[in-house]
Amino acid sequence: MSAPTHTHSPLYLGLMSGTSADGIDAALVRFDDASHRRCELVAGITVGWEPQLREALVALGQGAEQMAIDRLGRLDAQVGLAFADAANQLIAEAGVAREQIRAIGSHGQTIRHRPQADPAFTWQIGDASRIAEHTGITTAADFRRRDVAAGGQGAPLMPAFHLAMLGASDEDRAVLNLGGIGNLTLIPRDGAVLGFDTGPANALLDSWCQQHRGTPFDADGAFAASGKVDAALLHALLADPWFALPPPKSTGREQFHLAWALQAMGTATLRPADVQATLLELTAATVADALLRHQPTTRRVLVCGGGVRNPVLLARLAARLPGVVVESSARHGLDPDYLEAMGFAWLAAELLAGRPANLPSVTGAAGPRLLGAIYPA
């Protein structure tokens, strides 16, 4: 756990669980002033899901289960309680008083994201009323749906936070989150910020590794490193028309899952390690292609999310981006493991300050909007 510091400024607590559903990230954050342009990670923890609950979330997230309303209602309550427990655990371990925390910002757990549907919708579960009730702290949640209601994708939401914390006046930058799904924030020295999903990242890699190695993720990319990229499979995967769509665009497990990869594989018989290497190359290729297509002047890519701990993936990405510095967001003072949770603490702070937090240039929304709903303590 990151060590806490102590001042009198209010704290915000961010809660995040991504498409990989590999745990709940909880981050205590302090902002420098009312503008919320600089922040400090006071403390952070990751709390694993109870195995049966994680199994249900993964199945629901990739569309494998059409869940009865009663079961979905219970799952919503269970996820809310798990988020509350993670917040309470962080507060206890950090040794801070609840009165110091002005609000919790909870992302929830995405179970469906259908921005192309008619009508478009996105759905995150994790009952925020229960978080407020069981922590005694005002909770902000449901950040994506207002952007969707305004004609946007509802994702990604982190580019506004990335711009506030990591923008630079002397170079064109990108922030790359390698979670279950990869997403890029393109931050030019001048001009509009662009942000969008790039396609599958850890979600496919983790699922294949779990199926063939019995481990939840590919530690240090060793499984992928032991295989060779299959050019035919990579070509088939890259042929998916989603990759050619222009921004704004977003996606999730419901589109990119193992059944999708197996369909591309067809009747070919491949070594599991070769498939893992190919899935890793798919992530590197789609990220690099998107970056070169939409901001070829990028000089620095700041990486966060679980993929930052995969040196094989980072090496392949760097090989596809000659002349571009690829480095962890930690080099710029932001812990890559908690950057998204910190971002949802920031979204809570912006909502309470009455400031819009979406970027229409990123999501395609009709205009700036206040994001989220407030559940009082």
From Swiss-Prot:
Catalyzes the specific phosphorylation of 1,6-anhydro-N-acetylmuramic acid (anhMurNAc) with the simultaneous cleavage of the 1,6-anhydro ring, generating MurNAc-6-P. Is required for the utilization of anhMurNAc either imported from the medium or derived from its own cell wall murein, and thus plays a role in cell wall recycling. Its EC number is 2.7.1.170. Belongs to the anhydro-N-acetylmuramic acid kinase family. One of its GO terms (biological process) is amino sugar metabolic process. Pfam families: AnmK. It comes from the Bacteria. It comes from Xanthomonas campestris pv. campestris (strain ATCC 33913 / DSM 3586 / NCPPB 528 / LMG 568 / P 25). It catalyses: 1,6-anhydro-N-acetyl-beta-muramate + ATP + H2O = N-acetyl-D-muramate 6-phosphate + ADP + H(+). ATP binds at G18, T19, S20, A21, D22, G23, I24, D25. It is an enzyme of class 2 (transferase). PANTHER family: ANHYDRO-N-ACETYLMURAMIC ACID KINASE (PTHR30605:SF0). This is Anhydro-N-acetylmuramic acid kinase. Keywords: ATP-binding, Carbohydrate metabolism, Kinase, Nucleotide-binding, Transferase. Pathway: Amino-sugar metabolism; 1,6-anhydro-N-acetylmuramate degradation; Cell wall biogenesis; peptidoglycan recycling. CDD domains: ASKHA_NBD_ANMK (cd24050). One of its GO terms (molecular function) is ATP binding.
